[in-house]
Amino acid sequence: MAQPNQPTPQFQMAQIPLAAFFDNNESKTMLNSMNLRLNDMDLKLSLILELLATRLPDQRLPSIFTSPPQTVISEAPPQSFTPSATNSTSDKTSSSLKTELKTEDSDGDLDMEGEEDTEELFDNESQPSQRNQSPKETEVEDEKVLADGPFPEGAVKRAAEKAARSFQSTQPKVFAWQILRESVTDDELRNVQISLRTFHGETADHLLGRQLPKIRLVVEATMKYFKWDLLSTESQLSKAKLILSHLKNNAKVRNWTLREGRPNRVAPATPPVNVDLVWKRYLALLGPAGFTGILPNLPQNLCNGGTQSPSIPQIDPSLFKVDA
């Protein structure tokens, strides 16, 4: 019998694998790699939290650190067991971060680059908000833009509506030509002179200053409506030359039309139908030169209204009678 002080063989068998496991080099390397991996993850998480704490403004910091515990406490059921080691470590890290933030706030050494970045973000976000305004606000702005300029009443609005119905690439050309047509008479259009010659270092203002006053006003209104006046100097010059060349070509075509006249585009009216003429054509088709010539075996007297030929067999009408 086994003595009571002697360990049981089962306990000895349980100790041997554990000792062999901890003495094994592969298990040690695996544990070391896992430990290094966990330390690396902990370091990265701490860096992320520090970046969030320094980059975000002070108003958003309490919401980050206070809102998650509230949601967890309200949703989680009451538990009787003690908190695990991971929870204790997370609480320690959060408390340490809070204390670090308090000390930084008290010393006044917070990084100001984060606030500058947020201000730039808010400034950049305010610009698209102005672009993505409601239709009423855009209509009010368009009315302000359309009201400017010494043009006939409603001319700019009609030009904008006509340009909106065309392709996007041709909208500025259509807009400018429509305003010019309503602002200039045909006699004035004959004497229009548009200069496209540019010199080295010339700007759009210099080029438009050498044009006629009405041409200059039309081009300036077009560039203002399509916000081309906010472009660079070279881009403004190219856009102004584009509009001027289009106006010059259209003025040439319009002057040629006024001088030579426009051909009549209306198709001539069809003459009324003559019933006698229709019957004559129908009889000509039934005559010897018509279908009769195509069918030579058909006797001519059938077409001419004569009697039937004896070669055609006669059909007894009594065959189609039905006895009552």
Swiss-Prot record:
Composition bias type Basic and acidic residues, residue spans: 134-146
Biased composition (Polar residues): 67-85, 124-133
Signal peptide coordinates: none
Keyword annotations from UniProtKB, A to Z: Nucleus, Transcription, Transcription regulation
Main location: nucleus
Start and end residues of each stretch annotated as Disordered: 67-151
Biased composition (Low complexity): 86-98
GO molecular function, one term: sequence-specific DNA binding
Known tissue expression: Widely expressed, including in pharyngeal muscle cells and body wall muscle cells.
Gene Ontology biological process terms from the UniProt entry: lateral inhibition; negative regulation of transcription by RNA polymerase II; positive regulation of Notch signaling pathway; regulation of cell fate specification; regulation of development, heterochronic; regulation of mesodermal cell fate specification
Amino acid composition bias (Acidic residues), ranges on this chain: 106-123
Highest taxon above the source species: Eukaryota
Subcellular location: Nucleus
GO cellular component, one term: nucleus
Disruption phenotype: RNAi-mediated knockdown suppresses the hermaphrodite gonadal development and egg-laying defects in a lin-12 mutant background.
Protein task: Putative transcription factor. Positive regulator of the lin-12/Notch signaling pathway. Binds to specific DNA sequences in regulatory elements. Involved in cell fate decisions that require cell-cell interactions, such as the anchor cell (AC) / ventral uterine (VU) precursor cell fate decision. Heterochronic protein which controls the choice of stage specific cell fates, including the larval L3 stage-specific fate of seam cells. Involved in regulating the temporal expression pattern of hunchback-like protein hbl-1, thereby playing a role in the progression between larval stages L2 and L3.
Subunit record text: Multimer. May interact with mediator complex subunit mdt-29.
Protein name: Putative transcription factor sel-7
Natural source organism: Caenorhabditis elegans
